[in-house]
Each structure stands twice: as C-alpha cells, then as structure tokens.
C-alpha cells in the first residue's frame, strides 16, 4: 500500500490575529486578547496573541486570569525597572523589550464570530488553489487536514515546501500566519503540529513546520509528558492511565504488549484507538472520513448561563432552547423520538453556607477542581418521531421537572434530540399492529387521532411561516412571549454564533 502524506495546518491565534490585522497591528508583536468584557471578567478568552502568551497566559483562560497575570508581570517589571518606577505603558512586545520602564498593556477585542467565519472561508479558498476539496477535512474554523500524497509529484515539491507555499499564500492573502504538521498518517501530522512544532523556532513570519513518521514519533515522543498534549487524550483518560502507572505514550505502548487486557478493561473498545496512537498508527484516511455516514444521529445545544439561575428561570431558558431545537429540526426536515437533558449546578450551592446546609447529595469536582453538586441527567421518550413544538416543549418541561433539584442554583443547561431521522423515512404513528379489545371506543380514538394530526399539520404550517420570515429578516423578527420574560436568553443568543457575539 502506498505511504500517504498528510499536512495539518493551524492558523496561529486565529481570532486574535484577525482582530490585529483589522486594526493594522502586527499579530506577532501586539498584546491582544479576544473576549467579551461586557460579560464580566469571568468570561472565557477565545484567543490570545503569541506575545501575550509569552507572559504565561493560557490561550483559553478567563479574562480575570489574563488581568491578574499581567498585573503580576508588571509588578516584576516595576521591581526591576530603574528607580523601581514604571512610566507609561505599551501593548507592543518590541517596545516593552526596548524600554523596561513601560508597563505591559493589552487590547481587549470583543469577538465577531461572523467576521471570523468570513476570514476562514477566504483562507479555505486559498487551500483550494492547491488541494481539491475531497482531500481536505475542515477540522475547525482555524484548522484543516490535507491528504497531499497525490500532489507532491504534480507540484514537484517536498511536503515541507508545499506546506510552506500554502502558508505563505495565506499570509500574503490575509496577513494570518500558521503552524503546520506533516505526517504519514492523520494522527502523526496532528501531533507534529500540536507538540513538535511548539518546540522549534519560528521563522521571520512566525511559521513553524514539523514532521513525524512512526519511528520518529517513538523516538521523540514516547517519553513526552503530559499525556493530555496528545490528540484525543483528555483529563479523564490521563487520570485513568496515571492511576495504573502509565504516564507516557511509551508506557501505554509497553502495556499493550504486556497487558493489553488492562487497557480494554479501562477504556473498552476505545482502547484499540489509544493503542494504535501509542505506536504512532492511524488507519483512518481522509477518504474514509468523507465516506463515513453515522448509523444514528442527534442534534443538540448547550448553554452556560451568565449567572446562577433558580430552577424556575432555568426552566424558561431550557424551553427556549427546546423551541430553537425544534426549529432546527423543521428547517432540516428531521424528526426525533427522544430528548436528553443535562442540568449543571453552580458552585455557589456549596460555597454559600446556608445553601450548603440544605444539600445532601453527591459532590463532584468541576474543570477547575472546585466542588459542585453532581449534575442531573435524564431522558424522555416521545412515543413517536416528531418535530412538533407543543409535543417537544411539553416533554422538555416534564423531563426538567422530573430530574431537577429545585433547591439548587443552575449554571449549565444541555438538551439533545436523539434518534434523529429524515421526516420522510419516519414510521407513521398508526403503522404498528395492535390487539383489538371490546372496551375501547375505536371511533372516538380515531376521531381524536385525526384531530391531533390536523393540529400538528396546522402547527407545521406555522413553523414553516416563521422560518420563512426569520430567513428574510433575522431570528429576532418573530419572538414568543417567553422570550421577553425576565431571565430569557433566546433574544440575545439569536444575535450570537457559538455563544459569542456575531
């Protein structure tokens, strides 16, 4: 079988770079963070420029963490400055290096998601100048995989030179620089980009390109820590592995030889993927990904509330989310027969002494290691495939009431529609056989079913009318009464993309 060559490209601090370019600033020399300051200092930073990261700031931290770290760095600069005094400030890395008397400053840019998507489309069109769409996997708004095996001979270029040519074209077209990884499979090119490229010096344009093959992976990364640096190894996986004496990919590879059963006990069938990656293997190709069709589908959304909500207010927000989910189903011509809801509780339930006394349930740790009440999770079967607003909202309310702890403050909500299928392929409600009996009034039941079907058809016409108006005038062109109640979030979220300002 022909050895394949893959390139992964990641646009460097993409959102932050776009904001710098639009301000006429150099993304490699400007301290800038993309965050919605109007949401308070606890808001998540979507991107941080490389110069600001050099002060030990995480690319996905909270805004208050950025401010705190800059404050600490300025305290250090003041201590080292002549006369222990800072005079003025600058957000430019080059100026800060030249003048130790300047305080570190930075720009806070509110996110503009629609604009970033437009930029991403322009960059994707640059990729299409070199590689056909069937050989590109769009992994995220700022990251792609390319199978360039059949292009190297055409362009008479090495993988490194082709990657550089594409990246420089993106830089010339948009002013955005990038990092690339080259590998003999998708896993290796991703790891080369995520891990190896970070440890090599950038060129004058800020470009880093790293390469890996299977043997290079084993020689260079079998001892790499932490495990969470590797693609698809999250905190949960790493914790389980460390509890069983495995701290590196080399440890996992050795365990797969000596005690493979242990890995399958820990991770089930997912152990096969972990073992492959530990050896630097990845059989999946771009072609296989393009051809994949999942056997089951779901559609869902999640929301982190700006402040802790009571159960009553959270129920309103969940109903709004269910209503939005229904309109997505209708627009795509889909139906569902099952809803899943997850309710995440706020840390204040345990930090407030009065609330803490009332709670006697399970306690877990959140992403930051803080103690919070265990989330509530439940499923509601609808009895038929449907996209009816009434049926789904009623089921959502019933499920919420059944699983929620009414005494706790709520911070997160998730809802998903499971077993989603095309409306045309959905089984009819009366298609199943049933045993007749003497005690059922079938005439009355048939009349009731006909009325229900007529009501659903009338509702469907209204849904389509609403969709038509919203497509033309925007999602807020038609709102429901619940969208105007105190605590409702749908109106604001309709003006967002991915939970951030459009």
Identify what each model region corresponds to.
Residues 1-277, 282-286, 443-502:
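Gly/Gly-Pro- and Ser/Thr-rich, intrinsically disordered tail segments characteristic of DNA damage-repair
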Residues 8, 229, 237-410, 425, ...:
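DNA-contacting surface of Y-family translesion DNA polymerases
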Residues 12-14, 38-42, 345-350, 420-424:
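Short, charged/polar surface micro-motifs in flexible loops or helix N-caps
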Residues 18, 369-502:
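Acidic, metal-coordinating catalytic segment for phosphate/diphosphate chemistry
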Residues 39, 153, 187, 304, ...:
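Generic "edge-of-domain/loop-turn" microfeature
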Residues 71-80, 311-322, 326, 408, ...:
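Contiguous hydrophobic segments
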Residues 177-179, 340, 414:
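Residues at or immediately flanking beta-strands
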């Amino acid at each position: 079988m022909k050895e394949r060559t893959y390139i992964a490209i990641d646009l460097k601090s993409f959102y932050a770079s776009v904001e710098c370019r639009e301000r006429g600033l150099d993304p490699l020399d400007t301290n800038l963070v993309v965050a919605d300051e109007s949401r308070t200092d606890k808001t998540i930073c979507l991107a941080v420029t490389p110069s600001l990261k050099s002060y030990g700031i995480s690319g996905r931290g909270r805004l208050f963490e950025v401010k705190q770290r800059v404050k600490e760095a300025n305290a250090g600069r003041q201590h080292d400055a002549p006369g222990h005094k800072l005079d003025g400030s600058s957000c430019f890395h080059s100026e800060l290096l030249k003048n130790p008397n300047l305080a570190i400053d930075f720009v806070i840019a509110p996110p503009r998601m629609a604009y970033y998507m437009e930029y991403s489309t322009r960059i994707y069109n640059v990729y299409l100048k070199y590689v056909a769409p069937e050989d590109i996997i769009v992994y995220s708004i700022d990251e792609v995989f390319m199978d360039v095996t059949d292009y190297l001979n055409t362009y008479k270029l090495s993988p490194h030179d082709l990657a550089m040519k594409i990246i420089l074209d993106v830089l010339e077209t948009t002013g955005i620089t990038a990092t690339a990884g080259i590998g003999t499979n998708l896993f290796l090119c991703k790891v080369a980009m995520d891990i190896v490229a970070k440890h090599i010096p950038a060129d004058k344009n800020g470009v880093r390109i790293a390469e890996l093959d299977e043997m290079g992976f084993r020689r260079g990364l079998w001892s790499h820590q932490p495990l969470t640096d590797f693609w698809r190894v999250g905190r949960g996986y790493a914790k389980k592995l460390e509890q069983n004496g495995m701290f590196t990919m080399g440890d996992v590879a050795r365990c797969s030889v000596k005690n493979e059963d242990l890995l399958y006990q820990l991770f089930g069938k997912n152990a096969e993927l972990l073992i492959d990656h530990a050896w630097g293997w990845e059989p999946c190709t771009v072609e296989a990904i393009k051809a994949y069709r999942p056997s089951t589908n779901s559609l869902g959304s999640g929301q982190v509330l700006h402040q802790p909500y009571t159960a009553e207010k959270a129920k309103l927000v969940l109903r709004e989310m269910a209503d939005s989910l229904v309109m997505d189903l209708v627009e795509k011509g889909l139906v569902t027969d099952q809803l899943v809801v997850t309710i995440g509780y706020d840390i204040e339930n345990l930090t407030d002494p009065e609330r803490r006394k009332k709670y006697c349930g399970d306690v877990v740790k959140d992403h930051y290691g803080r103690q919070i009440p265990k989330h509530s999770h439940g499923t509601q079967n609808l009895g038929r495939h449907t996209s009816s607003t009434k049926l789904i909202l009623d089921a959502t309310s019933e499920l919420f009431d059944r699983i929620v702890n009414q005494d706790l403050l709520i911070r997160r909500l998730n809802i998903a529609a499971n077993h989603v299928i095309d409306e045309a392929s959905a089984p009819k409600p009366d298609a199943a056989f049933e045993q007749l009996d003497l005690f059922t009034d079938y005439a009355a039941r048939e009349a009731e079913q006909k009325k229900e079907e007529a009501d659903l058809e009338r509702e469907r016409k209204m849904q389509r009318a609403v969709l038509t108006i919203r497509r033309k005038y925007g999602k807020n062109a038609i709102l429901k009464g619940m969208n105007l109640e105190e605590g409702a979030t749908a109106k604001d979220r309709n003006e967002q993309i991915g939970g951030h300002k459009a």
